[in-house]
Structures are given as structure tokens and as C-alpha cells.
A protein has these predicted regions:
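A glycine- and Lys/Arg-enriched "phosphate-lid" helix/loop adjacent to the NTP-binding pocket
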Residues: 266-336
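Flexible, gly/pro- and Lys/Arg-enriched active-site loops
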Residues: 53-58, 76, 81-180
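NTP-dependent small-molecule kinase module
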Residues: 170-182, 310-384
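Conserved lysine of the Walker
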Residues: 195
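Conserved substrate/cofactor phosphate-moiety recognition/catalytic segment
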Residues: 204-245, 265
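Hydrophobic positions on the alpha1 helix immediately C-terminal to the Walker A/P-loop
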Residues: 198, 202
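Short, surface-exposed acidic-centric catalytic microdomains
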Residues: 25-72
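Glycine-rich phosphate-binding loop used to anchor ATP phosphates in small-molecule kinases
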Residues: 231-293
């Protein structure tokens, strides 16, 4: 078997936006580039500056470095298509500037070019401090000394004295970086809905850690399904203690996807305990909740009971063999009613989704979660 080595070319791109959600356009474009046969290596700081060459709104600008096997023309077409998907309509009129949601320019490439469609290096970058400053940052971060020397020379000769104001947020290179810099994402839902499967898939795609429920460590669980009245309290207290201890150890960690949170204990206690036992349980739960950090994002999976029963039967866990449809319906209803107040909640109806076996279904779920994670990051930086 022979493997053909693919030559990767290094490019530097400039990104700008002065319309709508400027940061969202730029950050999303970087993520999208990274998933199109392109590896985003480094991002500069984000800067705000006044529009140049026309009277318009202030711009956000940044530069990135990428490696790709695409040719310069192929890369240009990717960038133009991405601009179009963000609502940019380029004009063919010479030297015409206007407000735009997304602007992507090829600044430097492996070879010089000069034709009607593309010129490298970019013919006007030497006149623009908002290009040269972030470009220098990226070249320095990659220790690209040859380009760095040329950029430093251009900066020393640049007559552009406009002010660049740093924006207080770090641009990320990929969705993997977004997950690694996000607070814990919790995937919950009824028994058999696919929480653990989705957690494992997300962890594999974004190279993050999982934190999964340890059902087998609860010695009362199998007895509970045989005699719920006798074993409900010890079962729920054991789960509460186990969850609180495990989650408390993760309070300061990021980049984790979990298939439960401490609120799961309250939900099942409400379902399974009599009033007297529930009062005792709530005393321990109140203390445990204070010691546990809220999740960054709470995702609730839902499915009809018929599907849940089918999945439970397929995985054939002995301690789940006694679960009946009425109990599943109570749990499902409790989740749908009880978590409407969770912050940053996303409810996903999996009735017609097979995210384990269908890539498109899994991609759709990832898109929904990624959208919320990015929105949450911008909100936390007061930049939404």
C-alpha cells in the first residue's frame, strides 16, 4: 500500500466585519474555514478601527494563519463562497467600499501572484495598519521569521496612523477550541434516550473529556427496580452522594461533557420518594447543590416512550429489565416540565434522529450545540 504525501501551503488571511453581529461573523467564519480542508493554525487579537476609504461603521479586524492543500484560486473561491453565505455581495466596481458583514482577504501565500482575480501579496496591505498589526502577531506566534521581517519593515514604513483598539476576547481556531474553553456541557433526558452515546460521540469529535454516570456502583439500584418502596431512599441518597462528590471535583474544569448533573437527583427523588423520605432527602440535596457549579450548557434529549423501551431492550442491562412504560412516561414528563427554567437550555427531539448511525443527524445536533456555546461565550464577554 502506498501513501501519497500531500503538500500543505501556508497562507495568511485577513478577516473583517462592520455589519450586524461583527464578532459572530468573524469567529464563525474562522470555524467554518477550519472545516473546509483547511487547518487554522493561529489567530491574532481582534481589533476595532474606523472604516477607511468610505464613511461607514467601525470594523472588527483580525488575521489568521492557515495550512491547506488547496491552491490559491481554490482557497479564494472558498473565501468568496463563505462571504456570500454570511450575506456579503461583492461589487465589481473598482475601488468601491461599503459596509459588509464579512470580508476575507488573502494576504500572503507560498508564491507571488498577479492577475485580474488575485494578487499575492495583497496589493494594499502595506497601506493598512489594521492588517499589518494583527498579521505581525500571527507571523510571530508561528515564528515565521522570513515573513515577520518583511511585515516589520512594512509597518515601519506605513503612513496609516489610525487607531486600533483591542477587543477583550480571544479568537478561537476551531470548534474543538470552543469546547475546550467552555464550561461543562450536560446532556440529560429519560432512561434510554441516548445521553451517554451522545456524550461519547461529542468527546470523540472535539477531543474533550467525558464524565459519565456510574450506575453500576450503586448497590441499591437493582433492588429498587424489584421493590421501589423499600429501596427508593437509599438508592437516591447513594446517587446524590456519588454525583455531588464527582461533580464537585470538576467545578473548575472546562472542556467536559457529562450525562448528568446534580439536578437529576432532585427530579428522581420527586418521582420515587414518599413525602417523609423526600423531606429528609431535600436536606442533603440543598447542601449538595450549593457545592456544585451549574453547568455551562444544559441539553435535554427527548424521545417517545416506545423508542426508549426499544433502546433499553437493545442494551440489555439486567437492572433495567423491570422498568415499565408507565415509569418511563413519568420520567420523561418530569424532564420536560421540570427543566424549563434551566439556563441556556436546548431541547432536542430525537424522534426522527439516529445520531449514533447517521452522520447528518449527529452533525445537526453539533451545529445546534455549537451555536449556543458561541453565543454564550460572546454573552460572557458582553459582546453578544
Amino acid at each position: 500500500m502506498y501513501f501519497q504525501l500531500v503538500k500543505l501551503n501556508r497562507y495568511y488571511l485577513g478577516l473583517g466585519s462592520n455589519e450586524d453581529a461583527r464578532l459572530t461573523h468573524i469567529q464563525t467564519a474562522i470555524f467554518e474555514l477550519n472545516e473546509q480542508q483547511i487547518n487554522v493554525l493561529s489567530c491574532s487579537a481582534l481589533y476595532e478601527n474606523e472604516a477607511q476609504g468610505f464613511s461607514g461603521k467601525a470594523f472588527y479586524n483580525a488575521c489568521i494563519a492557515i495550512d491547506t492543500a488547496l491552491s490559491s484560486r481554490e482557497l479564494l473561491q472558498r473565501c468568496l463562497s463563505l462571504e456570500l453565505s454570511h450575506g456579503r455581495a461583492r461589487t465589481h466596481a473598482p475601488a468601491t467600499y461599503q459596509d459588509r458583514p464579512l470580508d476575507i482577504d488573502l494576504l500572503l501565500g507560498p508564491d507571488s501572484m498577479n492577475d485580474s482575480d488575485l494578487t499575492l501579496p495583497h496589493p494594499r496591505m502595506a497601506q493598512r495598519r489594521f492588517v499589518l498589526e494583527p498579521l505581525r502577531e500571527v507571523a510571530a506566534a508561528l515564528k515565521d521569521l522570513q515573513n515577520l521581517d518583511e511585515i516589520e519593515l512594512l509597518l515601519s514604513q506605513c503612513r496609516d496612523d489610525s487607531t486600533l483598539s483591542p477587543v477583550n476576547i480571544r479568537l478561537l481556531c476551531s470548534y474543538t477550541d470552543l469546547w475546550k474553553n467552555s464550561e461543562m456541557v450536560v446532556i440529560e433526558g429519560c432512561i434510554g434516550v441516548g445521553k451517554t452515546s451522545l456524550c461519547n460521540q461529542l468527546a470523540a469529535r472535539y477531543s474533550i473529556d467525558t464524565h459519565l454516570e456510574r450506575f453500576e456502583s450503586n448497590p441499591y439500584l437493582s433492588h429498587f427496580y424489584q421493590d421501589p418502596e423499600a429501596y427508593a431512599l437509599p438508592t437516591e441518597l447513594h446517587f446524590l452522594a456519588d454525583r455531588q462528590q464527582a461533580l464537585h471535583e470538576l467545578n473548575e474544569k472546562k472542556g467536559i461533557v457529562a450525562d448528568y448533573h446534580i439536578s437529576k437527583s432532585a427530579l428522581f427523588a420527586q418521582l420515587n420518594l414518599n413525602p417523609q423520605d423526600l423531606a429528609l432527602f431535600n436536606r442533603f440535596y440543598s447542601w449538595s447543590k450549593k457545592l456544585t457549579k451549574a453547568p455551562g450548557l444544559y441539553v435535554l434529549l427527548d424521545a417517545p416512550v416506545e423508542q426508549l423501551e426499544k433502546r433499553i431492550k437493545q442494551r440489555a442491562r439486567s437492572y433495567e429489565s423491570q422498568i415499565d412504560s408507565a415509569y418511563l412516561e413519568r420520567i420523561r414528563s418530569a424532564y420536560l416540565k421540570g427543566h424549563t427554567s434551566e439556563e441556556a437550555q436546548l431541547v432536542i427531539d430525537t424522534t426522527h434522529l439516529d445520531f449514533v448511525n447517521e452522520q447528518a443527524d449527529f452533525d445537526r445536533i453539533c451545529d445546534q450545540i455549537n451555536h449556543l456555546l458561541l453565543a454564550q461565550r460572546l454573552t460572557n464577554h458582553n459582546l453578544a
